[in-house]
Amino acid sequence: MAPNLRKSHPLLKTINNSLIDLPTPSNISAWWNFGSLLGICLATQILTGLLLAAHYTADTTLAFSSVAHTCRNVQYGWLIRNLHANGASFFFICIYLHIGRGLYYGSYLYKETWNTGIILLLTLMATAFVGYVLPWGQMSFWGATVITNLFSAIPYIGQTLVEWAWGGFSVDNPTLTRFFTLHFLLPFMIAGLTLIHLTFLHESGSNNPLGIVANSDKIPFHPYYSTKDILGFILLLLPLTALALFSPNLLGDPENFTPANPLVTPPHIKPEWYFLFAYAILRSIPNKLGGVLALAASVLILFLIPLLHKSKQRTMTFRPLSQLLFWTLVANLTILTWIGSQPVEHPFIIIGQLASLTYFTILLILFPLIGTLENKMLNH
């Protein structure tokens, strides 16, 4: 009998073991769809990004008009740009839901998978930031100025570091060209990190909603979850195309329709919606270095999550107190996102400070505390 090429070919067998014959828990819910959705987001962003890069000019005098040219004169250029800009939003929606799933169901106990995931998140955030600068509108320019300036808070080397990043004494042409270089490079780095992320995941196999060992009841990935994933793709791509076609500027800032002008500061400098929670935490501390440290901590705190797991149960499925705390955290992040979009004035300042404090309190103190309490309740 001839050997099955799918199982014997060096390349095909890797694909087979990852996407076809992969043993998968039989009870994973739609919350497990977001990994593959992130893969589709990445593929879409790389494809649309390549097409945009073919028409883009990374020069301060030409960048803004080259983007306008793409939208006006290139076949379906407007659609490619709108898909790319809104695709970023969907990328972040998926990654935040994916992280939320990981938190709720204790997936972070696969430490290597979790840590590579956080590195992926940081790389994605860097990619989105440098990409936002490229159209060279007002918010692009001032966003770049404000965020890169944060590095000057680093003692002793800060100012040198910022000028080195800028390639001069302010955000200018060298900054734009290097940001374009980085924006082109980083998505491929994300693709590479994704393979590492999956390699670690397939070492242990997927977690499941019950948080129990599911080896005795696993099913092949294909056709069960391949079909389920395709349904997920459709449900992701439908709202993306709807947004890109009907309301492409809904999530953007009108300020970015004005070409960058170093002499005019926009009244409210704010990032895209997916960074607002971190921006609110940054602004809630009246000290520059303190704010920068809080900003970094708001994301890097995720590295500590596996160490703070005190419960005897892996998931929150049967832990109502932890569930309540989890949804409080979600509400808290929603409040932070809202505060980040508001001007720095009363009552937004105090709300932002309280929400920032609550964010760190829930993750660092209350989650381990409630976990320990629930363990005690199990004994009675």
From Swiss-Prot:
Record InterPro entries: Cyt_b/b6_C (IPR005798), Cyt_b/b6_C_sf (IPR036150), Cyt_b/b6_N (IPR005797), Cytb/b6-like_sf (IPR027387), Cytochrome_b (IPR030689), Cytochrome_b_C_euk/bac (IPR048260), Cytochrome_b_N_euk/bac (IPR048259), Di-haem_cyt_TM (IPR016174)
Main location: mitochondrion
PROSITE patterns the UniProt entry points to: CYTB_CTER (PS51003), CYTB_NTER (PS51002)
Binding site for heme b b566: H98, H197
Pfam families for this protein: Cytochrom_B_C, Cytochrome_B
Transmembrane segments: 34-54, 78-99, 114-134, 179-199, 227-247, 289-309, 321-341, 348-368
GO cellular component, one term: respiratory chain complex III
Highest taxon of source: Eukaryota
SUPFAM superfamilies recorded: a domain/subunit of cytochrome bc1 complex (Ubiquinol-cytochrome c reductase), Transmembrane di-heme cytochromes
Family statement drawn from the similarity comment of this UniProt entry: Belongs to the cytochrome b family.
Assembly description: The cytochrome bc1 complex contains 11 subunits: 3 respiratory subunits (MT-CYB, CYC1 and UQCRFS1), 2 core proteins (UQCRC1 and UQCRC2) and 6 low-molecular weight proteins (UQCRH/QCR6, UQCRB/QCR7, UQCRQ/QCR8, UQCR10/QCR9, UQCR11/QCR10 and a cleavage product of UQCRFS1). This cytochrome bc1 complex then forms a dimer.
Note: Heme 1 (or BL or b562) is low-potential and absorbs at about 562 nm, and heme 2 (or BH or b566) is high-potential and absorbs at about 566 nm.
Name of this protein: Cytochrome b
